[in-house]
């Protein structure tokens, strides 16, 4: 399929490679079983075709790659061995011309990263293909055979472990623990763990025994390895951890166990896929829901800047899109090409997903408008206005308080005038006068004015002040007259006593 530069076609809009067909004629039914040629070919309808291009490609490649051409195993005249190794220079040349492989013709090979085609679908799934080891008996020694097939009695296996190194590797860098874990021989795994073998040795794909056990769905062996302290976060050559393989296998129990033993839920592989993004890309709805409950990052980005929502839209999974929208995910985020999830949905003609995104956007708009017209905010505004009014009234009160001393001064002047009329300013007051007024205070014995702290609206009228001061003056005058009377009585008593003394002296 030849795509335009910078475009990102959806999975449902993949077209057949007519450009290559026109050169090769009709496709070989064995190599490309779903692609039967173009109607525009100059080849007849009988099925005959010019296969010179196919022969040339075969002669260069030798044996077909089983991942790219699973039904066509090459020519018996090839000088390539039976291991399946081949010269892939022609395949690389073909990739450079075609860009992205047609998913019908090449179901397992997704093209080259150097292609001019956009990043959609440019993921190599070969890491998840054929999880089990390819084992040949002649390549294994006694210990590795016993670990793989597990048919050796326990006593013989113990003797075997004493005589040989339990961490010995074969040609593919696999230990006995790798082989036993991948094939589910839990008794051998337990015996090796009891003998304290090394846990984190890597094979030729940089995978630990735990990674192989999870990849091959051998949960019992994987749990035993986790209990003995195997590191669950060691990535293989593709960047995948054990959790990535558990998510790919939709093994929720294994994923839960890995998280319980410290697996990183945000670890990324070489494509920038976290376990959540991998689950979305592979349309594993149940494990996606599981990871969302485990608080996986919904805004994580792959190497092309795509979120989980964009991946779900590109895959055409309406159920996962609906699941992500329930989490209030950001629908306006763009990838490195500047496209949003809605733009992908429109270009791929995913009408159901377009409707889901439109409904979600309308709900968000209504929510924002309701928040803007919130009555609580109106109450806050009214309370702020009232507080401003109160502040204004408080600012006016000091002016009223400043007028009080003038009023008090007027009342003091009236008191002084009344005192002058009665001549009280020239009298000496005793020390026990009310309000503590004395002649020594420098006020000529006058009563000091009382300062009122009440506002102007609460002060007494002028008539009441005059009555108060006149009553106070009458009391002082009464007190003075009483003191004068007592002085007269004391003088009379003294005079009477002097007369008695004189009478007594005359008698003597």
From Swiss-Prot:
Question: Which domain of life, per UniProt?
Answer: Eukaryota
Q: Bias category Polar residues: which stretches?
A: 367-376, 476-488
Q: Which PROSITE patterns match?
A: ANK_REP_REGION (PS50297), ANK_REPEAT (PS50088)
What keywords sit in the KW lines?
A: ANK repeat, Repeat
- Residue ranges for the region (Disordered) are 367-488
Q: Where is the composition biased (Basic and acidic residues)?
A: 377-392, 406-421
Which parts are the ANK repeats? 172-201, 205-234, 238-267, 271-300, 304-333
Q: Which family does it belong to?
A: Belongs to the POTE family.
Q: What is this protein called?
A: POTE ankyrin domain family member G
Taxonomic path: Eukaryota, Metazoa, Chordata, Craniata, Vertebrata
């Amino acid at each position: 399929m030849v795509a335009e530069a910078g475009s990102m076609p959806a999975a449902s809009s993949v077209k057949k490679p007519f450009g290559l067909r026109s050169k090769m004629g009709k496709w070989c039914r064995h190599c490309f079983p779903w692609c039967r040629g173009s109607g525009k070919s100059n080849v007849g309808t009988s099925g005959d075709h010019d296969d010179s291009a196919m022969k040339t490609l075969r002669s260069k490649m030798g044996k077909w790659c089983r991942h790219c051409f699973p039904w066509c195993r090459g020519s018996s005249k090839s000088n390539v061995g039976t291991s399946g190794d081949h010269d892939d220079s022609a395949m690389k040349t073909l990739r450079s011309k075609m860009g992205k492989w047609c998913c019908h013709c090449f179901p397992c090979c997704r093209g080259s990263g150097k292609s001019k085609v956009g990043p959609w679908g440019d993921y190599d799934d070969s890491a998840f293909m054929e999880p089990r080891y390819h084992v040949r008996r002649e390549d294994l020694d006694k210990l590795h055979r016993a670990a793989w097939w597990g048919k050796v009695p326990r006593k013989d296996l113990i003797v075997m472990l004493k005589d040989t190194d339990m961490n010995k590797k074969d040609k593919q860098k696999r230990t006995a623990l790798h082989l036993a874990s991948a094939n589910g021989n839990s008794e051998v795994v337990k015996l090796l763990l009891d003998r304290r073998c090394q846990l984190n040795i890597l094979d030729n794909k940089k995978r630990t025994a735990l990674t192989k056990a999870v990849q091959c769905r051998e949960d019992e062996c994987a749990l035993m390895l986790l209990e003995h302290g195997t590191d669950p976060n060691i990535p293989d050559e593709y960047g995948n951890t054990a959790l990535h393989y558990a998510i790919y296998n939709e093994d929720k129990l294994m994923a839960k166990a890995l998280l319980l033993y410290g697996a990183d839920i945000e670890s990324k592989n070489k494509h920038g896929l976290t376990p959540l993004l991998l689950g979305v890309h592979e349309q594993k709805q149940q494990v996606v829901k599981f990871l969302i409950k485990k608080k996986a990052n919904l805004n994580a980005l792959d190497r092309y800047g795509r979120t989980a929502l964009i991946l779900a839209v590109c895959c055409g999974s309406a159920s996962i899109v609906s699941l992500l929208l329930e989490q209030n995910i950001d629908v306006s985020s763009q990838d490195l090409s500047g496209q949003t999830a809605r733009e992908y949905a429109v270009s791929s003609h995913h009408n159901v997903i377009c409707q889901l995104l439109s409904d979600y956007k309308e709900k968000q708009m209504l929510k924002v408008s309701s928040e803007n017209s919130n009555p609580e905010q109106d109450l806050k505004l009214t309370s702020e206005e009232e507080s401003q009014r109160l502040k204004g009234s408080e600012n006016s009160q000091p002016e009223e308080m400043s007028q009080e001393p003038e009023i008090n001064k007027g009342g003091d002047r009236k008191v002084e005038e009344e005192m002058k009329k009665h001549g009280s300013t020239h009298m000496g007051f005793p020390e026990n006068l009310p309000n503590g007024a004395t002649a020594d205070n420098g006020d000529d014995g006058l009563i000091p004015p009382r300062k009122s702290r009440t506002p102007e609206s609460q002060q007494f009228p002028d008539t009441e002040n005059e009555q108060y001061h006149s009553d106070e003056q009458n009391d002082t005058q009464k007190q003075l007259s009483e003191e004068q009377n007592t002085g007269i009585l004391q003088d009379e008593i003294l005079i009477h006593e002097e007369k008695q003394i004189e009478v007594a002296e005359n008698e003597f």
